[in-house]
C-alpha cells in the first residue's frame, strides 16, 4: 500500500507542477516590443520621434518630449483626427504612425497639405516614394530614415533604416554594398549567358549557297 501511495504521489507532483506553470504562462500579460512612432502638438509646430510598446507608454513619453504638463490629454491620429483611447486599437496601428496630442480645449484641424476628398485632383502616377528623416534621440549619429513607397494609391510598403550610431551606419553600408555586388554578379552572369547563346545560334546558321541557275541557261 505504501509503495502504491508513493508511486501515485510521484505521478501527481509533475502533473501539479505542469498545471501551475501553464496557469502562470496564461496569466502572464503579453509584452509587446517597442516600436517607432511620430508625435506632434496640436498645431504641428513641434514633432518628435518616440519609441513605445503600449498606449500608456506612448502618452507618457509624448508628454515628456513635448514638455506638456497638463494631465488631461487626448491622443488622435494626425491624418484624420481619430481618437486612440484603447490598447487594442493602438496595437493594430503600423510602425511610424503619426499621432497628435491634444490638451484640454484644443481640437484637431487638418494640416496645410490636407485636401478634402471631393477636391482632390486625380493622380496619374503609378508609384510615389517619400523619405522621412527624424531622430529618436538627440545623441543619434544621423537618426532614422523612413522610406515609404505607395503603388497606385492603394498599396504601400515602408522600411525604417536606423542610423543611431556610426557602427550601425557602417553595417548598413556594407550590407548594401554586398547586396549590390550580388545583383551585379547575377546580371553579368545572365548577360554573358545570353551573349554566348546568341553567338552560338549565329555560328550554327548555314551560309547561303551561290545560285548556279544561270550557268546552264
Curated annotation (Swiss-Prot):
Record GO biological process:
apoptotic process; cellular response to cold; fat cell differentiation; lipid droplet fusion; lipid metabolic process; lipid storage; negative regulation of cold-induced thermogenesis; negative regulation of execution phase of apoptosis
Read off the Pfam families from this record.
CIDE-N
Every CIDE-N domain range:
33-110
Question: Per the record, what phenotype accompanies loss of this gene's function?
Answer: Mutant animals appear normal and fertile and produce the expected Mendelian ratio of heterozygous and homozygous descendents. They are lean and resistant to diet-induced obesity and diabetes. They exhibit higher metabolic rate, lipolysis in brown adipose tissue and core body temperature when subjected to cold treatment. Mutant females are unable to properly feed their pups who die within 3 days postpartum due to severely reduced milk lipids.
| Keyword DNA-binding carried by entry | no
| SUPFAM superfamilies the record matches | CAD & PB1 domains
Q: Which GO terms describe its molecular function?
A: lipid transfer activity; phosphatidic acid binding; protein homodimerization activity
Q: Which GO terms describe its cellular component?
A: cytoplasm; cytosol; lipid droplet; mitochondrial envelope; mitochondrion; nucleus
Q: Which domain of life is it from?
A: Eukaryota
Reaction equation(s) it catalyzes: a triacyl-sn-glycerol(in) = a triacyl-sn-glycerol(out)
Q: What is the effect of changing residue 23 to A?
A: Substantial reduction in nuclear localization and loss of XDH induction
Task: Tell me the compartments it is located in.
Answer: Lipid droplet; Nucleus
Q: Where are the residues of the annotated region Amphipathic helix?
A: 163-180
Kindly list the cysteine pairs connected by disulfide bridges: none
Q: What induces it?
A: Up-regulated under conditions that enhance triacylglycerol deposition, including rosiglitazone treatment and high-fat diet. This up-regulation is mediated by PPARG.
Q: In which tissues is it expressed?
A: Highly expressed in brown adipose tissue and, at lower levels, in white adipose tissue (at protein level). Undetectable in undifferentiated preadipocytes. Expressed in mammary gland during pregnancy and lactation, in epithelial cells, but not in the surrounding adipose tissue. Secreted into milk via milk fat globules.
Q: Which UniProt keywords apply?
A: Activator, Apoptosis, Lipid droplet, Nucleus, Transcription, Transcription regulation
Instruction: Name the InterPro entries on file.
Output: CIDE-N_dom, CIDEA_N
The keyword ATP-binding is annotated on this UniProt entry: no
Family indicated by similarity: Belongs to the CIDE family.
Q: Subunit structure, per the record?
A: Homodimer. Interacts with CIDEC. Directly interacts with CEBPB. Interacts with isoform CLSTN3beta of CLSTN3; inhibiting the lipid transferase activity of CIDEA.
What is the annotated role of this protein in its UniProt record? Lipid transferase that promotes unilocular lipid droplet formation by mediating lipid droplet fusion. Lipid droplet fusion promotes their enlargement, restricting lipolysis and favoring lipid storage. Localizes on the lipid droplet surface, at focal contact sites between lipid droplets, and mediates atypical lipid droplet fusion by promoting directional net neutral lipid transfer from the smaller to larger lipid droplets. The transfer direction may be driven by the internal pressure difference between the contacting lipid droplet pair and occurs at a lower rate than that promoted by CIDEC.
According to the UniProt entry, the note on domains is: The amphipathic helix mediates embedding into the lipid droplet phospholipid monolayer, promoting phosphatidic acid-binding, thereby facilitating triacylglycerol transfer. The CIDE-N domain is involved in homodimerization which is crucial for its function in promoting lipid exchange and transfer.
Name of the protein in question: Lipid transferase CIDEA
Q: Which organism is it from?
A: Mus musculus (Mouse)
What gene is it encoded by? Cidea
Amino acid at each position: 500500500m505504501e509503495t502504491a501511495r508513493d508511486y501515485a504521489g510521484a505521478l501527481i507532483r509533475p502533473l501539479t507542477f505542469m498545471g501551475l506553470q501553464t496557469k502562470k504562462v496564461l496569466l502572464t500579460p503579453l509584452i509587446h516590443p517597442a516600436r517607432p512612432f511620430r508625435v506632434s502638438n496640436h498645431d504641428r509646430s513641434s514633432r518628435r520621434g518616440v519609441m513605445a510598446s503600449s498606449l500608456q507608454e506612448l502618452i507618457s513619453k509624448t508628454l515628456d518630449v513635448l514638455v506638456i504638463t497638463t494631465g488631461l490629454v487626448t491622443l488622435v491620429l494626425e491624418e484624420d483626427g481619430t481618437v486612440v483611447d484603447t490598447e487594442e486599437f493602438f496595437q493594430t496601428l503600423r510602425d511610424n504612425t503619426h499621432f497628435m496630442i491634444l490638451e484640454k480645449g484644443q481640437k484637431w484641424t487638418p494640416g496645410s497639405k490636407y485636401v478634402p476628398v471631393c477636391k482632390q485632383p486625380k493622380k496619374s502616377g503609378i508609384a510615389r516614394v517619400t523619405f522621412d528623416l527624424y531622430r529618436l534621440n538627440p545623441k543619434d549619429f544621423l537618426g532614422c530614415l523612413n522610406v515609404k513607397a505607395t503603388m497606385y494609391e492603394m498599396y504601400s510598403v515602408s522600411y525604417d533604416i536606423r542610423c543611431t550610431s556610426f557602427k550601425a551606419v557602417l553595417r548598413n553600408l556594407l550590407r548594401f554594398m554586398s547586396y549590390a555586388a550580388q545583383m551585379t554578379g547575377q546580371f553579368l552572369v545572365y548577360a554573358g549567358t545570353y551573349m554566348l547563346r546568341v553567338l552560338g545560334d549565329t555560328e550554327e546558321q548555314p551560309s547561303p549557297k551561290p545560285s548556279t541557275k544561270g550557268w546552264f541557261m
